[in-house]
């Protein structure tokens, strides 16, 4: 691969950066969000041109999805170097040069010798076809087609660099299979990703050589044999008779592990940004204190992931209508909630920052791997030699995937902690228990089932966080005595990402439920205040003979009661004597009566005598007004509009409510939470959440707000 800054020598080494640490550091320049935006852009490219050195995670994720419009093209400039290495192998064998995998046996039996190079490659593919598929099309022992497509793309890219001794025509054939959405069937298990992903990759070779046991999946999902696969792909020259080294070139690489790792990391990076935005929305609906995002706090900690996470949250919360309202509430009653928010909110930048750094570092490691030459031996045409080494060892994959999985589990743990606060009326600052949205809390248990499911998801996710790479077994007659387990780790990380999508779905729908409940709360509170004010004016202002009554001074304090009491603590039966509203209103009237002094002895000026009249009038009027306000909300005609429309987080809410067609969940509705979750989950899996997510941050300049 060429030196990134152009400062190279004849041997292909970078003079200024011979160990590539500089290039690795340079790759991490800029914000994580900008990198995610770049990935998304690459994911949407119509054409992916492969040359061996510039393949990206986003491109692999695009091709992995068979429904993608992205087409793969091979850089014609690679043809000459690929041919040169292939010619070198043939020339070397004709001269009788001894070379591993060309004239020798494999692995621990490389002491064996043969001059039948083609037959040796044929046998290699045969004995590596050791996978188990089971019976039936729906067998769970087949690698998903998306992973196979990713592996095919990565393997082409590696072989294009011209160090592997394979014909260009074989790479063109694999490309045709990709572009025509014809996917070889590979076994799910059976590789330790050292020497590369031998067993699964041998099934791609099996299709190319027309092995009778080889199967592929057609564009319509039907299972087909190798002949039909070639026909559908438009490959007309017949099956390949492998030349010396070509079988080894096809199978001895890390493409399956690194291909899957790429698709996993594409999702992981997006989910990491989503978790940052979730934390900001969580702050909004919980009436939190945005002080936790102040740049000085995070600047003094120095960690870039933390600094960026805080800056992203700060941007979402800056100017938020919810934060303006929360500030007024905190000023009205500083003791209504703790001085500091709980850790799930207040330390969310410190928690998410290291996870973002890990995921970002893993992404860069995998991008180096997918652009590497990772087979053995390597053909160095310029020095006229075959180099025997171990680039097939997929340790970067195993380690990166283990680390990513741990980061994913930590993100999930934070989501669970935040969700647990959100649904708990002891912690959620006035929202109803279980986020129940119906009129009767005794017949509406909201997100109770969802909270149980979240606990299940989180538990499984924490289990998956355990490492894979410490379970290595010595293999192949103790020749492969250390091995990376890269694909196994990538598969487990794919599972973890899937579970995090389930958690993200549940949490996002819960956040939108909370947003709607805050909207309902604000309208109900306004209605209660207006009604109490009107009743107070009618009942408390005047005496029997029309004279001004001392109880008229109670109105202001009665309104303060409404400001301080959580609406959902009483609104299902607002005039119940067992609920806090009526108790506090009566307490205010009693306190005023006790301060009324001698006037209480006069029936015309007694405040005590007004209490029953006030309560009786309120019982007649308030329930009707509350119901009218709720009906107006349900009809979309509320007097006060939803504050979310004035917030930077609005695109996500709009997406969930309008694009996926969900609405407020109530016990009065037949629709279950799971039905709504499915809509959002499918949208996330289809990638439709990406644009609304990035829209939330489209005007962020990549820097924290100035310290003032």
Curated annotation (Swiss-Prot):
It comes from the Eukaryota. There is a cross-link at residues 194-196 (5-imidazolinone (Ala-Gly)). Pathway: Alkaloid biosynthesis; Phenylpropanoid metabolism; trans-cinnamate biosynthesis; trans-cinnamate from L-phenylalanine: step 1/1. The keyword Lyase applies. Mostly expressed in stems, and, to a lower extent, in bulbs, roots, leaves and flowers. Its EC number is 4.3.1.24. The modification 2,3-didehydroalanine (Ser) is found at residue 195. (E)-cinnamate binds at residues 252, 340, 346, 376, 448, 476, 479. GO terms for biological process: alkaloid metabolic process; cinnamic acid biosynthetic process; L-phenylalanine catabolic process. GO terms for cellular component: cytoplasm. Contains an active site 4-methylidene-imidazol-5-one (MIO), which is formed autocatalytically by cyclization and dehydration of residues Ala-Ser-Gly. Keywords: Alkaloid metabolism, Cytoplasm, Lyase, Phenylalanine catabolism, Phenylpropanoid metabolism. The active site is at residue 100. One of its GO terms (molecular function) is phenylalanine ammonia-lyase activity. It is an enzyme of class 4 (lyase). It is found in: Cytoplasm. Its main location: cytoplasm. Homotetramer. Belongs to the PAL/histidase family. This is a key enzyme of plant metabolism catalyzing the first reaction in the biosynthesis from L-phenylalanine of a wide variety of natural products based on the phenylpropane skeleton. This is Phenylalanine ammonia-lyase 1. It comes from Narcissus pseudonarcissus (Daffodil).
